[in-house]
Amino acid sequence: MPIHENVGGLIRLAKRRNGILLALIAMCVMTLSVSLRAKSNDQVPYPMGYRMWTHVRTVLIGPQSPAFESFGGLHHIYANGKAMEGYRAGRFPDGSVLVFELLETRENAGVTTEGPRKRVGVMVKESKRYAETGGWGFESFQGDSQTERRLNPEGRIACFKCHEPQKDNDYVFSKLRK
């Protein structure tokens, strides 16, 4: 066999191996990016436009409440359309989003008004994604920030532990006013 035929065969073999190598590298990169995306997908997103959703109720937690240190202030609770279905049915479907906006209060001449925003708490219902926490994902955003997250994984579990006694109400404290 002439040498140039062997060289051609070797070049074809090298190209095939490089193709396989490139394919393996591409698969590794794709697997890594899917894995990283999955980790970041566990995070609950900021609920853009939530103040245009249905306002469910307002609650004032005052100094006499044992929850005052952590949750003292004025709470406005908002629900997206799916969550409103859940309030009516007693079980919240996947895609439900509940937001509680916690504001400081201002007192002046016997009138209580809203002060600065302390945080925006968010619950997102996705049964499979958040199976460990009753199907709910939890997050809290600092003040007016849409990116400054307040919860680490342990904090999310702590949120669920607090909501656990509300299991019969699908882990939700608030109810629609009749």
Where are the predicted features?
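Intrinsic structural disorder/low-complexity segments
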Residues: 7, 78-79, 166-169
